[in-house]
Amino acid sequence: DVCTVDRALYEHDSFDGFRVVHVPGHSPTDTLYLHESGGFTVTGDHIIQGVNPNPIVRRPLPGQERQPSLIQYQQSLLRTRYLPLGKCYPGHGQPFSNHIEVVDHILERQEKRNEKVLNALGQEAQTPWMVAQRMYGNMSAGDFIFCVSVAIGHLELLEHRGVLRCWRDHHGVLWYQRKNAGIRHAFIIPETETTRESVQ
């Protein structure tokens, strides 16, 4: 069936006692519906007890840049941690009331995954695809987007924190390397490649 949109909702809007809180990351449109007087929140897939929701890399809309989904997600999680959510009704699983503990658990698991990404990266310059292969081996078609999204998300996060440097080669491919490592690639690439540092 085709549904008609009666009303577009935006950050800080309210309806029927609910407050709209935009929490992008897991998906660009993730939203909390916070009912403070009722003491509960519809959290959807933003936080789920016992699950580490993975932000999937998505193609940007025409004229827009792709957003760093994992960085967005962590920012949204830190915001969510301090909201008075009360009882949470997620998109999957059972309701829960310990949202601070759930948020902290997700953030802890992401830090552990950062270490796995760094271990897979080693001291060489690698692409996100190469890191995903080192982490997951042969990926099925169904797991491909998940595995590559994990690699891209954590590489972007580590670059954002100043741990990695990143540059784009003349084919448009992104490469990442630890900042404390000399320039070494996992395999030979053309000497005409330019790095972000050399352009600046």
Q: Residues of each region from the PLM?
A:
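Metallo-beta-lactamase
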Residues: R19-N114
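Acidic/polar short surface loop at catalytic or gating sites that assists cofactor/ion binding
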Residues: D1-C3
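Short acidic-hydrophobic, aromatic-tinged amphipathic segments that line or gate anion-handling sites
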Residues: D6-Y10
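Short polar/acidic secondary-structure junctions
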Residues: S14, V23-G25, D169
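Generic structural signal for short, solvent-exposed loop/turn connectors between secondary structure elements
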Residues: D13-V20, S37-G39, G122-Q126
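C-terminal regulatory/interaction regions
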Residues: E115-Q200
